[in-house]
C-alpha cells in the first residue's frame, strides 16, 4: 500500500512538472562599468567617499535607480564636515542628494569607470553650493 502511494505521488510530481514553462534567465543591469571608491572599483556602491585623503565628504545610503554603460543615477545622503572652527572640530552637515555619474573612461587598470559626478543637495552646503560637479578618480589608490 505504501509503495503504491509513493508511486502515485512520484508520478503526479513528474506530470505536474511537465506542464510548467522552463525558467527564464534573470537579466541583470550589470554593465561592467564602475566608480572608483578610493581603493576599490565598485558597481552600485551604497557608500561613496568623495575625498579619500580625509573622508571630508561621504555619500551614503545610496539607492541607484539606473546604472548603464553611459550614466548612473540615484539618491542618497551626503555627510560633509563644515570645518568650523577647524576641520578637526567641525560638525557633520547631512543633506539629501540626487546623484548622477557620467563621462565613462577606461582606467589605466583597463576597467570602464565613471569620471564625473553631479550632485544636487536639498540645502546649501558648507562650501556655499547647492549643486556640484566634480571630477572623480579614474583609478584606485595603492
Language model regions located:
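Sec-dependent bacterial lipoprotein signal peptides
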Residues: 1-16
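Bacterial signal peptide processing site
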Residues: 18-21
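N-terminal export/targeting and maturation segments
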Residues: 23-52
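Intrinsically disordered, low-complexity regions enriched in small/polar residues
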Residues: 36, 66-69, 116, 123
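Mature extracytoplasmic domains of secretory-pathway proteins
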Residues: 49-108
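Helix-rich interaction surfaces within compact, conserved domain-sized segments
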Residues: 89-142
Amino acid at each position: 500500500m505504501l509503495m503504491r502511494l509513493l508511486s502515485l505521488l512520484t508520478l503526479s510530481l513528474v506530470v505536474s512538472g511537465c506542464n510548467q514553462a522552463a525558467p527564464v534567465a534573470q537579466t541583470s543591469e550589470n554593465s561592467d562599468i564602475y566608480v572608483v571608491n578610493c581603493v576599490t572599483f565598485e558597481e552600485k556602491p551604497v557608500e561613496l567617499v568623495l575625498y579619500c585623503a580625509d573622508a571630508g565628504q561621504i555619500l551614503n545610503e545610496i539607492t541607484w535607480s539606473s546604472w548603464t554603460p553611459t550614466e548612473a543615477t540615484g539618491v542618497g545622503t551626503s555627510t560633509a564636515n563644515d570645518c568650523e572652527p577647524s576641520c578637526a572640530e567641525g560638525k557633520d552637515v547631512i543633506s539629501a542628494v540626487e546623484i548622477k555619474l557620467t563621462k565613462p573612461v577606461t582606467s589605466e587598470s583597463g576597467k570602464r569607470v565613471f569620471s564625473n559626478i553631479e550632485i544636487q543637495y536639498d540645502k546649501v552646503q558648507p562650501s556655499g553650493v547647492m549643486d556640484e560637479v566634480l571630477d572623480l578618480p579614474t583609478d584606485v589608490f595603492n
